[in-house]
Regions:
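Cell-wall polysaccharide-cleaving catalytic domain and substrate-binding groove, primarily
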Residues: 1-129
């Protein structure tokens, strides 16, 4: 199931997201895909700055916990797509853009490009590193 434009399957939180137009079965519905990408970028920035999640394993482990996902397979897939070890820290904006491509595919089989994510990153000035 994919809630409207929620290409990362972002769950409803305490505060509504920018561009949130509703909810569906515990997931956010976004006005546009761009809003979903923006929300994912904000989450990634929060993971890095507040929770010190720097590696694919740490990020995916928090985003897609084992009680809801095959987290180990998810981590392997993302690491393969980035050609990184699951334990290597992400250091560049490009790394996060590529991770977003892999995560959107894992979550909803949505095909994004790193440029799709980078354009939203620039537009809203959401730089993670």
């Amino acid at each position: 199931m994919i809630a409207t434009n929620n290409i990362f399957n972002i769950r409803v939180g305490k505060q509504p997201w920018f561009g949130q137009v509703g909810t569906k079965k515990g997931f956010v519905e976004f006005e546009t895909r761009e809003h979903a990408i923006r929300a994912w970028l904000v989450l990634m920035r929060t993971y890095r700055r507040q929770y010190q999640r720097y590696t694919i394993r740490d990020i995916v482990g928090r985003f897609a916990p084992p009680n809801e996902n095959d987290t180990a397979a998810y981590v392997r897939y993302c690491a393969q797509q980035l050609c990184y070890s699951a334990h290597s820290p992400l250091r560049l904006a490009q790394d996060y853009c590529r991770l977003g491509v892999a995560m959107a595919w894992m979550e909803t089989a949505t095909k994004l490009t790193a440029d799709d994510i980078y354009e939203v990153m620039k537009k809203y000035n959401i730089f993670i590193v």
